[in-house]
Curated annotation (Swiss-Prot):
Protein name: Alpha-defensin 20
Annotated gene: Defa20
Removed propeptide positions: 20-58
Phylogenetic placement of the source organism: Eukaryota, Metazoa, Chordata, Craniata, Vertebrata
Keywords attached to this entry: Antibiotic, Antimicrobial, Defensin, Disulfide bond, Secreted, Signal
Main location: secreted
Biased composition (Acidic residues): 25-40
Amino acid sequence: MKTLVLLSALVLLAFQVQADPIQNTDEETNTEEQPGEEDQAVSVSFGDPEGSALHEKSSRDLICYCRKGGCNRGEQVYGTCSGRLLFCCRRRHRH
């Protein structure tokens, strides 16, 4: 079941990468930081809506951000956003 969750995350990431427009070479050489480019929030959830054991144990919600430079403590790189930003995710804490 953990494999299914991982594959789902990879498929979601692949769709996101394909949905991003291809950057022009002029944009890639521009090094000025654009407002709102850093720390764009994305929420990703996996699991059975009926609250199965899979949802409770192995597919906790992820909180993801597109970050410039590197992921914060507790986050892992899951890919890229728009080619230049890192797609960083961490597990949401459950109470």
